[in-house]
Regions:
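Terminal disorder- and signal-encoded targeting elements
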Residues: 1-168
């Protein structure tokens, strides 16, 4: 990861931390880390700490193309895992449409980027079951094609999950 990318991502930390206080939410999960994903695999983060309604915000950046899948049920995630294991699941759920997307080339940064919401704020979630946030580097679901002998995906993940604390 080059210096510009690191500095751009590092400046988001304080903003995300104070946003939880200003908007009335409590940060229950935060990931800010570089990840390495082998071709044909995915990196998963389980989201289960939210008690009822909450909010989610993420930005993922990498030099290679990738997909983001956000599964709202263990059953949907199990289909994804089965696919990665070489099985042929009966279906390949695309994940929640509000959060699942392909990384798009950002001309200014010369990196691929996926973020939700697209304005950099937060989007509402309701966690009844464990949710799964996946940075995918496989050929799952007709997403971004990945060659078998491609280099590993080197990405930076900035993921924040908030629990609503305002009275209704």
């Amino acid at each position: 990861m080059d210096r510009r990318t690191f500095l751009a991502v590092a400046t988001l930390g304080p903003a995300v931390g104070t946003a939880g206080c200003v908007a009335g939410g409590r940060v229950v999960q935060e990931q800010q880390q570089s990840i390495l994903v082998e071709p044909g695999r995915g990196w998963t983060n389980e989201i289960s700490e939210v008690d009822g309604d909450g909010e989610l915000s993420y930005t993922v950046r990498a030099e290679q193309r990738f997909d983001i899948y956000y599964f709202t049920s263990t059953e949907a995630y199990d289909h994804y895992r089965a696919f990665l294991s070489g099985e042929e699941p009966p279906e390949t759920p695309a994940g929640h449409s509000k959060f699942s997307r392909a990384g798009v080339h950002n001309e200014d940064r010369d990196l691929y980027e996926a973020k939700a919401p697209s304005d950099g704020g937060r989007a509402s979630i309701s966690v009844e079951d464990t949710h799964y946030f996946v940075v995918d580097y496989s050929n799952y679901g007709m997403g971004v094609p990945v060659e078998e002998h491609a280099d590993p995906l080197d990405a930076f993940v900035d993921l924040a999950v908030f629990e609503n604390t305002l009275p209704i």
